[in-house]
Amino acid sequence: MSALIINEYREQGGTAISFPEDISRARQKLFRFLDNRFDSDQYRENVRELTPAIMAVLPVEFRTRLAPQNDTMSLIASAMKECSEAKQAVLLNAPEHQKMKEVSEGIASLFRLMPEQVGPLMTMVTSMLGVI
């Protein structure tokens, strides 16, 4: 992961921080910045400088935990992931509690696509299912 961060930083045109070519030494330098054991302002600034590269290489599920994305593409990506996991749970005949968890997460992720319309959507869905 550290090599990905460093390479992405360089590809984004980052020049304020120099990293050694040896990946072990570069990794050590990166982790010193992130750990910041001595509460250094310079290390904090280095992490700020590296943040776009770090966010670019993180998997979506970790990225949204650090900085929740409310843009349409992130919401759609999340909905696709959650619905895919729900379908897998059903196809693989997972235990009932696992299917319930995955399906409910999929449904919630779809509602997040239109948060201002959750009430009307709930009404429509329940009437389509014949619950009302």
UniProtKB/Swiss-Prot annotation:
Keywords for this protein: Early protein
Cell cycle recorded as keyword: no
InterPro entries recorded: YdaT_toxin (IPR009364), YdaT_toxin_sf (IPR037042)
Keyword Kinase: no
Pfam family, one: YdaT_toxin
Source superkingdom: Viruses
Role: May be involved in activation of synthesis of the CI protein.
Protein name listed in UniProt: Regulatory protein CII
UniProt gene name: CII
